[in-house]
Amino acid sequence: FPSDYMIARMIQENMLLELNFDNIPNYQYIDENFRNTAYDPENKYSVPYTWGTVGILYNTKYVDEADVAKGWEVLWNEKYDDKILMFDNSRDAFGIAQYRLGYDINTTDKTELQACADILAEQKPVVQQYVMDQVYDLMENEVAWIAPYYAGDCMMMMESNENLAFYLPEDQGFNLFVDAMCIPKR
């Protein structure tokens, strides 16, 4: 059940079997927005089963909604020094930097990528921790107040702490991801 970016790599490395869609009659119900995608442009290797977004999880007790409404910039706000979490993976961290700077999420321009690396380095003094799954404990227990994370996971955390809220910076852009089913060749 790989994510979109890994499916593209697996196709490129000839690691997946082509699917026989005669054996997948319910594929007809897959929304057109999830067919002929950049990661599987000919719809040969994958069937999406879930999708999601990356947004900003924050604690309404401590974080000013006006700051969150500024979008990704809140993750650099010194007002929340040592209460900000950041992804511990380059894909999502660079994506946030790209959106913050107004760059295309798929940019390969070396100058733009260096600018992203630079603002991520500038962010380091205000970041409490670089995390993945640790975000659950840190946000639910109010050790941290702001974190970028996956919307579905944020909804689960919000059930555990009524002070948590989710913001999707639509004006700046956000990552949309797809996880799909595939059949490996081996």
Annotated model-derived regions:
Residues 6-7, 85-89, 93, 97, ...:
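Ligand-binding pocket segment of bilobal, Venus flytrap-like solute-binding proteins
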Residues 11-18, 40-44, 156-168:
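Ligand-binding "clamshell"
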Residues 61-85:
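Hinge/capping helix and adjacent helix->loop/strand transition within the periplasmic-binding protein
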Residues 61-70, 102-109, 186:
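Short helix-loop capping/hinge motifs at secondary-structure junctions, enriched
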Residues 1-2, 17-56, 83-85:
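A structural signal for short loop-to-beta-strand junctions that line the ligand-binding cleft
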Residues 159-186:
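Extracytoplasmic/periplasmic substrate-recognition and gating elements
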Residues 55-62, 99-100, 177-186:
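A bilobed periplasmic-binding-protein/Venus flytrap-type ligand-binding module shared by bacterial periplasmic
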Residues 4-6, 24, 60-62, 80, ...:
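Solvent-exposed coil/turn segments that connect beta secondary-structure elements
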